[in-house]
Amino acid sequence: MRVEQLSIDIVGLAGACSYALDCIEAEFVNVKNKHGKRVAYISVCMAKYCAIQGDALQDLAICALLHDNALTQYISEEVQKYPDTDIKNDLSENKTNMHCVYGEKNITKIPFKTDISNVILYHHEHADGTGPFRKKWHEIPLFSRIIHLADIVDIIGNSIESADHRWDFICQYLSQNKDRLFDSECVNAFQKGLTKESFMCLRDDSFETKLWEIVPREKQFFDWETCKNVADFFAKIVDYKSSFTSRHSIGVAEKASLLAHYMGYDSVSVQKMYLAGALHDIGKMAVGNEILEKPDKLTDDEFSKMKNHVGYTYLILSEVNDFEDIRDWAAFHHEKLNGKGYPFGKTADELNEQERMMACVDIYQALTEDRPYKKGLSHEKTCDILDDMSQKGFIDSDISKTIRECFGRI
């Protein structure tokens, strides 16, 4: 029997994730919001003067959007090894090779249509061989060189307060650093691919419309293994945000799909539940670690900010075409049947079975997993808590009973 495949707007999903990554960069590296999308826009504008089109153009856009995909992993591991490290200075001194290594490994989870080997690995290399891996321009993939130039241009451009002076300053900067930081081909592609007018649209949100006009957003059909790889890629980014929830998203994804299969859902719905579980906490990327990892009870203001994460999940995933089901299953996991949940205060008649399932699975996973400040509860104790919550009108009693049966087999 042929297994149905899930259709996904992978470029849109990469764009949505880039927003979450930008939140991390803004927190730790002082990069302005929508950095990933601006890098993608500059990159694809340069691409037409480098004979890049079709599938290759789409792959370049995805690489640009996700060029710093391992930043949360790098920061997490650095802080664990060196608790007193100054992350901002560590990154600004070009100690970037590890996040490039991690990012290159991570990106292999994404199903590209062309060869993007070493693109993320070498996206901080200099044309003259003075970058982290000492590669010269002819040893560096073209995509890497384009993304490197676009990355630097965006960071420097946003550091100049006077918007009217940015274009002239950038053009002068590129000319001064041609054949040193940047190769001639990429500098020429920037000068031909962008005008002052097209560059200045980066000041507002109009560049996003232009980005999606240039880049094809054709949906791709994924089999179960590919869907799982894509979901795990994004879950890993989310879970590295905080050491308190190191495997939470993947755990929710695994159990949500297991429960869906147990309840008789078709293969596409099971895949969608896995993806929704992997993405359910992507909004936490917009919440500071001082709140996520606070050892004491949160203040009312801090708890309000914490609750915003599901609203951010809804907002972030709304960027993906034809993703409404997965978005809602992911974003409504803190809603309650009695209408006292968040972010929207939905009531029982507004929450479908999949949304109720995700709420129960999230609670189950949170209670059973070990965290730095607590030991995970047993299956039986957790199910007793779920039953109590269902009796109080918070969650679905039938799903709570099914979880006791289904997860009791694990």
Q: How would you describe each model-predicted region?
A:
Residues 2-410:
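Histidine- and acidic-residue-rich, metal-dependent catalytic cores
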